[in-house]
UniProtKB/Swiss-Prot annotation:
The gene is NS. Interacts with protein M1. May interact with host nucleoporin RAB/HRB and exportin XPO1/CRM1. Keywords: Host nucleus, Host-virus interaction, Transport, Virion. Mediates the nuclear export of encapsidated genomic RNAs (ribonucleoproteins, RNPs). Acts as an adapter between viral RNPs complexes and the nuclear export machinery of the cell. Possesses no intrinsic RNA-binding activity, but includes a C-terminal M1-binding domain. This domain is believed to allow recognition of RNPs bound to the protein M1. A motif (Nuclear export signal) lies at residues 96-105, 122-132. The keyword Ribosomal protein does not apply. Pfam families: Flu_C_NS2. It is found in: Virion; Host nucleus. This is Nuclear export protein.
Length: 182
């Protein structure tokens, strides 16, 4: 009877020792990761500090200037849309035609707030796609949480934890976007 107790105590001590070693490895690795993040953040701040923060309107104006497109060409949108719809059948068979056409359908409302998108089929399609993306991200988060149990390497563990945080934040953003569309 006492032999079993000694064996179980030794086993528990062994497991506790291994857990402490693992925790020390994680702490060391985490400290190294934090130091790497600090240095990379400082480097990023040095390069980005020269740029002033801008609004969406400024970014759109800069993009228009970069592409050398004047705003008068944006007024010609109905003619451009008509040209896209009158494309020959040979081009419609091209694999790029469908993505271009779907892009043209959605680009006319790209400058609107989500709540001002007209109610109807397009809003329903957007909500359906966002909910599908959200459900896939939730499955990915679940799979990542299961993967944590089998991890032997502390670097992989840190990457999985980081990716789970990214998944959760993305899910929250998508849900808030869905709420703003409703």
């Amino acid at each position: 009877m006492s032999d079993k107790t000694v064996k179980s105590t030794n086993l528990m001590a062994f497991v506790a020792t291994k857990m402490l070693e693992r925790q020390e490895d994680l702490d060391t690795c985490t400290e190294m990761q934090v130091e790497k993040m600090k240095t990379s953040t400082k480097a990023r701040l040095k390069t980005e500090s020269s740029f002033a923060p801008r609004t969406w309107e400024d970014a759109i104006k800069d993009e228009i200037l970069r592409r050398s497109v004047d705003t008068s060409s944006l007024d010609k949108w109905p003619e451009l849309k008509q040209e896209l719809e009158n494309v020959s059948d040979a081009l419609k068979a091209d694999s790029l035609w469908l993505p271009m056409k779907s892009l043209s359908l959605y680009s006319k409302v790209s400058n609107q707030e989500p709540s001002s998108i007209p109610i109807g089929e397009m809003k329903h399609q957007i909500l359906t796609r966002l909910k599908l993306i959200c459900s896939r991200l939730e499955k990915l988060d679940l799979n990542l949480s299961k993967a944590v149990l089998g991890i032997q390497n502390s670097e992989d563990l840190i990457l999985i934890i980081y990716n789970r945080d990214v998944c959760k934040n993305t899910i929250l953003m998508i849900k808030s976007l869905c709420n703003s569309l409703i």
